Amino acid sequence: MNKQLPSTCGAPEHSLNRRAFLGGVGGFAGGLAGLDALGNPLLANQLEKRHKRVILLWMAGGLSQFESWDPKPGRKTGGPFRAIQTSVPGYRMSELMPMMASRVHKSAVIRSFSSPNTGHTGASVFALMSGDRQDTGTLRTPSLGCLLGRELSQPGLPDQVSFWNAAWPFSGGDKQHDFALFLGARYEPINIAHKLAPDGIQLPASLTDDDHRAREALREQLAARFQENRSGNATVASHGGSYQRVRGIMDIAGLFDVSREPLRIRERYGHSLFGQQALVARRLIEAGVPFVRLTDGWWDSHGENFEIHASKVPTLDRVMSALLEDLEQRGLLQDTLVVTFAEMGRTPQINAQRGRDHWGACWSVTLTGCGIKPGVIHGSTNADGTAVATDRVTAAQFFATIFQAVGIDHQKEYTSADGRPIRLTPYNTEPVRAVLA
């Protein structure tokens, strides 16, 4: 297990009581109803999206770009680790990531990501929900995962599953930045914290599956009568949908059981919880679940930054390379987009506690697989990593790139509950076309 190392963040959230992240069950997909795609452009677009999936590797707390994708060896900001040559000529990565360095020619790295918000909760909301929009109490946008789950949904499967291997250390938990909002509760994630599977998805020994299905059939009969004169009631529909979601997750309970995988596959991912959750993610993606988020925490290295990254980055390197290799070998990577992202990067300056603080001016993200041009190293920072040197990328542009990569029009417009138009990305946003295939 990774050694627990100190973090002395001065962010306002750190003054709140620390609580364990609470996992909940919610959000299953409906299917595309029998439609004839012949000659229909709208349906052709739906078919293009139908088998697309996204895995988000979320580095909670803020992975340091200096100790991963954008090292600055020999500079006062660089730290003690070497930079090593990668499989992309001229591009060097931290020595802590040798596995990814050997296969980064199959990924796209953006080294010029920039965000104005550097508080954990605010930055997470900014990154995961609003793109470059500042959400307010009257205008809020669904999270990236909820939007992708809605757009890529598959019949009988969860729209999104969200794993955590560490507690969100601020009041309110992850719920602060993973809302479906006007999309409806069915698109909210199944949240699984500190384990590999949701609780309570196995039938008790005293109840057979046939008995359970008979009870469900009776419940549906009674519910149909109740809904006869309430067909437009969203609350009633959501209540009925919750039963279907529970039944659906019970039907796929075996996907959460990694013991069904060959030992060599389990060993490839490693014994960390993050690694085993990544293996479950691959199983879910292979079955058609459209969006899985894997949250690895806690990267908030205000103290002992180099010790924390020396401990955690090799695990990320192993898990990420194993996941990408596994997806590729199974023929899944061409239809699966794998994203590494966080709420922020780390400061160039090294503080008195040998840590790096919050930093949004310039840091790194990656994209691999579906719709992405491999081997692209996009953007750059200056010699000390204190500013973007070329090709600044905003959160809105990054969102647009993700949507376009999986066949979703990033200019698509939804209507909120109060009738206001809300686009997937802000007006006048363009994707980063240099990384799109």
What are these regions (language model features)?
Residues 2-437:
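Ligand-binding pockets and gating/stacking loops
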